[in-house]
Amino acid sequence: MEKLLEVENLSVSYFTYAGEVQSVRGISFDVKKGKTTALVGESGCGKSVTAKSLMGLIEKPGKVKPESKIIYQGKELTGYTEKEWNTFRGKECSMVFQDALVSLNPTMKVGKQIAENLKNHESSLSKEEIYQKSLEMLKQTGVPDPEGCMNKYPHELSGGMRQRVMIACAMVTHPQLLIADEPTTALDVTIQAQIIALMEELQEKLGMSIIIITHDLGVV
C-alpha cells in the first residue's frame, strides 16, 4: 500500500540554559494512505512533540535535528520555509488538539473559525460559498442545529460539541492527513466513543489518513 508520510530518524532537542534536552530520539514510522497510525505512550514521552514536528510547529529553543527526515508524498519537509509550512498546514495536513476550549478562539463565533481555514487556502471562493462549505462540514460532524451552532461562541457549547467543531475546522479543507493529539482525553467515555466513531466515518468518506496520539490503548 502506498505511503503518504514517512518519518525517518526524527530527533528533536530543546537547547536550554542547562544544556541540550533530548525530547525525541530517532523515531521512525510511516502512515499509509487512507489508514490510521497510532502513536501510543505515557505522558511526557514525546508524542505531542513528534506531532508538532510533522506540522513545522517546533518553536525555539526547540529544534528538529539535521539527521531527521519527514517525507510527505515524496517531498522532504524538514527544509521548508515558514511560508511553505503555512501552505502545508491546513491544506495537506490538519491537527485536532486535546483541549478544544483552549484551542478555539473564545472571541470568535464558531462559523467564523471554521471559515478562516477556507479563506486561507481557497481564496477564490465567495463569502456565500465559504459559509455553505463551513456549514456542510459542521453538519457532517453531527452537530445538532448546525446553523445555530455557527453563530455561537465556544464557551456556549459542551465539551463534545467543541471537539466536533475542532474536527470541522481541521477537515473543512479536506486534508490528506489528520493528526489527532489526544482528541478524547478531556471527554467522558460515551462522548469519547462518539468522537472516535465520527473520525472513522469521516476517514471512510474522505479517504484521509489519521495519526492518533494517545496514552490509552482502549482508544486505539
Model-derived segments and spans:
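Hydrophobic anchor residue at the start of the ABC signature
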Residues: 114, 167, 178, 191, ...
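Conserved ABC ATPase signature
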Residues: 152-157, 161
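A short, proline-enriched helix->beta-strand linker immediately N-terminal to the Walker B motif
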Residues: 172-176
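A short, flexible loop at the N-terminus of ABC-type nucleotide-binding domains that lies
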Residues: 2-4, 13-26, 57-63, 80-84, ...
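Conserved ABC transporter NBD signature motif
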Residues: 65-76
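Conserved ABC ATPase "signature" region
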Residues: 69, 128-148
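Helical segment within the ABC ATPase nucleotide-binding domain
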Residues: 193-207
